[in-house]
C-alpha cells in the first residue's frame, strides 16, 4: 500500500551548485548516502519541519544508473518516490496496473534501513517512480 510521498528526486552532475540553489529556497540538507546498487550519491534536503524531501542524485562512479539520464536529458526532475509498506507487494501490484519495472527486485537505498525499487509509468504520464520502504528501526518519513 502506498502511504505517502517520501521525496522528489532531481538528477544533477553538480550537487554542490544545485544544493546552493536549494539553500536559497530555504531548504537544508538533512542526510544522504551512496546507493551502491545504482552507483549514485544521494543528498536529501528539506524545508524546516516539512516534507517531502528533495533528493539530489549524482553519479558516484562511471557507468552509474544516472549517467545515461544526464547524458540524454540533462539535469532536472528525475523521479517521485512513494513510501510503501511492502516494496515487493507494490512491485507486483503496479506491474498489474501497467507500470514497467526497472528493478527486478528491491535494492538497498541511500539511507539506513531504506529499500527501494524503480518503475516506469508509461505514456501519457511517462515518468519514473521510486517505491521506498524503511525497516521498522529506521525513521519513517511519512
Protein language model features and the residues they cover:
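Feature marks short, surface-exposed loop/turn motifs that line or immediately flank catalytic pockets
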Residues: 60-63, 135
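Short, surface-exposed linear segments at secondary-structure transitions and domain or protein termini
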Residues: 63-68, 139-142
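Short connector loops at helix/strand junctions that flank enzyme active sites
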Residues: 40, 49-51, 72-77
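Short, structured motif recognition centered on aromatic/hydrophobic residues
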Residues: 5-12, 22, 45, 53-57, ...
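Long, hydrophobic N-terminal alpha-helical segment
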Residues: 1-40, 64
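Vicinal oxygen chelate
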Residues: 12-20, 24-25, 32-34, 41-46, 52-54, 61, 69-142
Amino acid at each position: 500500500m502506498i502511504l505517502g510521498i517520501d521525496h522528489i528526486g532531481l538528477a544533477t552532475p553538480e550537487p554542490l551548485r544545485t544544493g546552493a540553489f536549494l539553500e536559497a529556497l530555504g531548504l537544508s540538507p538533512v542526510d544522504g548516502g551512496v546507493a551502491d546498487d545504482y552507483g549514485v550519491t544521494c543528498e536529501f534536503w528539506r524545508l524546516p519541519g516539512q516534507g517531502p524531501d528533495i533528493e539530489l542524485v549524482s553519479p558516484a562512479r562511471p557507468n552509474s544508473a544516472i549517467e545515461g539520464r544526464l547524458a540524454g536529458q540533462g539535469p532536472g526532475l528525475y523521479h517521485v518516490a512513494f513510501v510503501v509498506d511492502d516494496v515487493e507487494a507494490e512491485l507486483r501490484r503496479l506491474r498489474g496496473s501497467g507500470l514497467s519495472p526497472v528493478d527486478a527486485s528491491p535494492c538497498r537505498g541511500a539511507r539506513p534501513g531504506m529499500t527501494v525499487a524503480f518503475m516506469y509509468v508509461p505514456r501519457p504520464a511517462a515518468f519514473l517512480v521510486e517505491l521506498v520502504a524503511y525497516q521498522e528501526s529506521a525513521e519513517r518519513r511519512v
